[in-house]
């Protein structure tokens, strides 16, 4: 059985705070088991699995898919993109990878049609919208009453690999505009794609020009951990941006097979030769050293910035009008009262508007009714006049009919008299 720990107090440096005076640091005299907490955490993490989300931004055909395949040494099947897209789009693919029983869910988001349009003014907007959409989805999950963040598939982008065209001179305006728009939303690692197209002197000059332009435009790129010697060396040795070459083709160099690019005049680039390109440094720093830090930076810096701005737009704040700290309950009650008052005000305004519209409609209906009544009276008078006219015409027609029958009777009588006289004359002649 473990011995009972001593109650000896050990002074804590900088413990002038009165609330910390009663906290004592005790040293145990036996084994209790909580030293296995790191092992428990590792086992739980392995059982749950890891995830990593990469955003690749670059022009069509610059080598985004090839570099991702080279980074993970696998063939992630992708369809080739066309240069004739009318607008910029994004493709999202998720893969399940396994390395020495360590599972990794890899999500690769790539731009499609980026930089192919004549008008490139809004080419960066789909990228910004996608980053904000992932932050918003995570925020909505956080704000749920019954949330399940443990099972939630976090789609927030952890790193943006920005592929720079190897012009050898300077960054394009689109590059500066895009990186300036997303540097507060994602960790940016700039890459010079197809670096084998530049000589060493031109490549170093190009790197210096790129970093100078990034600094002069206030663009923030990812800073590797300073507590790691290799990372600190990258930040200060001028390796950024990384000059990379991707290839899954194995070529023979001497007596060994290496991944490289084979040209008619020979093997110009060995992908994993640090004298040829920075691919190995990029892979080690991205996957072996800083993957977890990239995820932490995404959550603690970029997401928190988005969350803070979003909640402030919704009216939430940590302090009141008098700069006094306000609890969430107080903020909720204040918001509820404000919303209730606003609802009452809007309800009263709606009632007044409704009554005003009712009065206007009533006046409109009265005017329409009066107009219809006048029209009815006018038509009624016209009808009566027409009836009188018809009655007069009928009377005249009846008189004419009577006169006609009288004339007919007189005519028949005269005709009969004539016939009688003619008959008498015939009889006398006989």
Curated annotation (Swiss-Prot):
Residues 329-410 form a coiled coil. Residues 58-65 are annotated as: G1 motif. The keyword Coiled coil applies. Residues 48-313 form the Septin-type G domain. It comes from the Eukaryota. Signal peptide: none annotated. GO terms for cellular component: acrosomal vesicle; axon; cytoplasm; cytoskeleton; dendrite; perikaryon; perinuclear region of cytoplasm. GO terms for biological process: cell division; neuron migration; protein localization to perinuclear region of cytoplasm; spermatid development. Residues 110-113 are annotated as: G3 motif. One of its GO terms (molecular function) is GTP binding. Residues 367-430 are annotated as: Required for interaction with SEPTIN4. Required for migration of cortical neurons during corticogenesis. Keywords: Cell cycle, Cell division, Cell projection, Coiled coil, Cytoplasm, Cytoplasmic vesicle, Cytoskeleton, GTP-binding, Nucleotide-binding. Gene3D superfamilies: P-loop containing nucleotide triphosphate hydrolases (3.40.50.300). Belongs to the TRAFAC class TrmE-Era-EngA-EngB-Septin-like GTPase superfamily. Septin GTPase family. Filament-forming cytoskeletal GTPase. Involved in the migration of cortical neurons and the formation of neuron leading processes during embryonic development. Plays a role in sperm head formation during spermiogenesis, potentially via facilitating localization of ACTN4 to cell filaments. This is Septin-14. It comes from Mus musculus.
């Amino acid at each position: 059985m473990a011995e009972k720990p001593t109650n000896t107090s050990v002074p804590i440096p900088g413990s002038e705070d009165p609330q910390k005076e009663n906290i004592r640091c005790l040293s145990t005299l036996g084994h209790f088991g909580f030293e296995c907490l790191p092992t428990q955490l590792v086992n739980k993490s392995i059982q749950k699995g890891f995830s990593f989300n990469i955003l690749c931004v670059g022009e069509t055909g610059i080598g985004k898919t090839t570099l991702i395949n080279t980074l993970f040494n696998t063939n992630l099947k992708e369809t080739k993109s066309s240069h004739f897209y009318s607008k910029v789009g994004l493709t999202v693919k998720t893969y399940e990878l396994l390395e020495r029983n360590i599972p990794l869910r890899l999500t690769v988001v790539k731009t499609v049609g980026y930089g192919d349009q004549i008008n490139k003014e809004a080419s960066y907007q789909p990228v910004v919208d996608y980053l904000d959409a992932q932050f918003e989805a995570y925020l909505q999950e956080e704000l749920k009453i019954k949330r399940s963040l443990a099972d939630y598939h976090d789609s927030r982008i952890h790193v943006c690999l920005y592929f720079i065209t190897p012009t050898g001179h300077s960054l394009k305006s689109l590059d500066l505009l895009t990186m300036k728009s997303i540097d507060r939303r994602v960790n940016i690692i700039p890459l010079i794609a197809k670096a084998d197209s530049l000589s060493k002197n031109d490549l170093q000059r190009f790197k210096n020009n790129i970093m100078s332009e990034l600094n002069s435009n206030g663009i923030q790129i990812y800073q590797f951990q300073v507590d790691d010697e290799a990372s600190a060396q990258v930040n200060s040795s001028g390796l950024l941006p990384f000059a990379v070459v991707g290839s899954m083709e194995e070529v023979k160099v001497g007596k060994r097979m290496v991944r490289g690019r084979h040209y008619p005049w020979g093997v110009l680039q060995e992908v994993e030769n640090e004298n040829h390109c920075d691919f190995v440094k990029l892979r080690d720093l991205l996957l072996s050293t800083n993957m977890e830090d990239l995820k932490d930076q995404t959550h603690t810096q970029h997401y928190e910035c988005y969350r803070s701005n979003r909640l402030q737009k919704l009216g939430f704040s940590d302090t009141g009008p008098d700069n006094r700290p306000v609890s969430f309950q107080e903020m909720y009650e204040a918001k509820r009262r404000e919303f209730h008052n606003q609802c009452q005000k809007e309800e009263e305004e709606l009632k007044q508007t409704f009554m005003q519209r009712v009065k206007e409609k009533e006046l409109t209906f009265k005017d329409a009714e009066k107009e219809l009544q006048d029209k009815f009276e006018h038509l009624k008078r016209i009808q009566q006049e027409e009836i009188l006219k018809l009655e007069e015409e009928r009377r005249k027609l009846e008189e004419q009919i009577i006169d006609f029958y009288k004339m007919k009777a007189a005519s028949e009588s005269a005709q009969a008299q004539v016939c009688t006289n003619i008959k008498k004359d015939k009889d006398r002649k006989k």
